[in-house]
Amino acid sequence: MTGRDGPDNGTAFTGVRIICGIVGLLARGEGDPVAAVRRQCDSIVHRGPDDEGLYGEPGFAFGMRRLSILDIAGGHQPFRSPDDRFVLMFNGEIYNFAALRAELAAAGRVFRSSGDAEVILAGYERWGAEVFGRLDGMFAVAIWDRQARRLVLARDPVGIKPLYYSDQPAGFAFASELQALTLLPGFHWTTDPRAQLDYFRFGHVRTPRTIHAEARTLPPGHILTVTRGAEPELTAYWTPRYTPAPPLPPEEWVERFRRTWLDTVAEQMVADVEVGAFLSGGIDSSAVVAAMTRVSDRPVRSFTIGFPDPRYDESRHAEAVAAALGTVHTTRTLDLVGAQDLLPTVAASYAEPFADPSMVPTWYVSRVAAEQVKVALSGDGGDELFFGYKRHATERRVGALPAPLRHAARAIGAVPTLPWRRANETVQRWTRTAASAGLPCGVSRFFAKLQITSPGLRAQVFAPEFLAMDGDPRGEIARLRAEYFPNSTALSADTLEQFALCDLALNLPGAMLTKVDRASMAHSLEVRVPMLGQKMVELALAMPAAMKLDGTTGKKVVRQAIAPWLPAGLFDRRKQGFQMPLSAWFAGDFGRYAEMLWRESGARDEGIWRRSAVDGLFADHRAGKRDHSRFLYALAVYCLWKARVRPAS
């Protein structure tokens, strides 16, 4: 949460930089909910150990936790409007607050502080809910209208800041983390079977669902209005759409990217403490650090994680980039024993099953960074907006095939994978591509490619009655497409642009940004993502696909923009990211640890499984017959949630 809200005495200053979590409860009765909200605040103290703010009145209370990056008097929330009608708490950063403040001041508003909290509230008083579409930043906002007894919640357009809510007979509650909801007295929780299936399909629960049937995430770019005696009203204030710009020469696109990128990074580096960066040595993180060194007047601190296995170790690439850019660089190595020891703690940070393989190294690099800085920049979002994944290149190839060949490829994709582990990693990727080739559009192929398990594997390990509750498996892709994109005419004709819209709707808020938020907040570290700044998103949604994908090479414009800043060849290599060597680890001690979790956590006793089939996957993987590491990793994390995180129903 930002609260550059010090006394406004006419002195210009960058202001207080704070981050936090917010929580609240609108009770059905007229009791005092402050004690319950204080307990919620205590459960997210890691998001802000320095300060607590609470507001309460009969039937309603909300609170926040704050980490002060510079503690200036007046940064404390809640923030009240001059007439005392509105009370605000929010979590985030508003980068264009100065411009909005000037506009409001020109209209006659007199400000009492120097910060963005008051600007949001003043904007809401003047423009109503329209203010949220004017904010450039990352935020989760809660505004209580004392006169109308109305609560308004809003979340930033791409979902950088989280916000969960639950509407139950005991009341309406919200929180920055799911675990804070589960502590409320009188609230009851059951596991959503569709969320369970989602998890084993995608490796995370699809937004807006959570693992609990009674809780939801507020979708990015949405407002939720809650009034007593009425159903909560959900409205979208921003929807991603491609708005192609007039044709420009390639070199002008590169210059536009470079200029926008430098401005965005400079904007997100404003702080009264040192700002660091995650550096994997790949294109996006290198672009972040290269820009930071150009807009900062002091050395940049960079951080990376290495692995003993050279096939997965990027630390030497990161160190080469750091040396070229002159950063103060820190590398730590994460081995099998360390990862296994960390996994229970990391899994608990999410309060629901979450199985991105890079969650452990991301958690670890956040811990390393938090030892030296309070703010770090990350390159997340670059692959999604500028076509950096393998799926973008393969989609171009598949999309160029005549329809009969695509349907033939889909039939080939049904052939079982080869029984050799080293070949199997590549074969499985191409099998997913082939299996999706005959699907009718880019959105459908995106959902097929994003899955971490095949329909065949799910039929093998899950009980038929569990799978049946989701309907005919042959129609699952069509159902997903209809859920996220009911208006197909709003989609771009370019399938890669459809991929980007899918990432903005599903993968970024549900997986990538969730991973980074929980990993960093566990260590009271603020992570900012300049690739997902408003101007960068607008640029990406206006840029032609040809500037992003050059044949089979993604992020063309990013490569060309940063080429003058780094020695040639530093980032022309195979993409890795902070990934763990799962296949090899599950063949040894890590696999035995996961199998122990499966047998002892209670998950095996659920009626959703074909238990002997799951037992067989462990044996097949150990024997090198099949690579089941993605499913087994998801299962291990699920077992940890089952045993340790899940609240009592």
Residue ranges of predicted features:
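Glycine-rich loop motifs involved in handling phospho/adenylate chemistry
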Residues: 275-284, 309-310, 357-360, 385, ...
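Short low-complexity, flexible loop/linker segments enriched in glycine and/or proline
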Residues: 344-348, 370, 392-394, 585-587
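Active-site adenylate/phosphate-handling loop in enzymes that bind or generate adenylated species
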Residues: 157, 364-423, 507, 512, ...
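Cysteine-centered catalytic environments shared across enzyme families
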Residues: 16-350, 362, 366, 564, ...
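Adenosyl-5′-phosphate
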Residues: 15-19, 183, 192, 213-220, ...
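Membrane-proximal basic amphipathic "stem/tether" segments
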Residues: 397-450, 636
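Ala/Thr-enriched low-complexity intrinsically disordered regions
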Residues: 2, 11-14
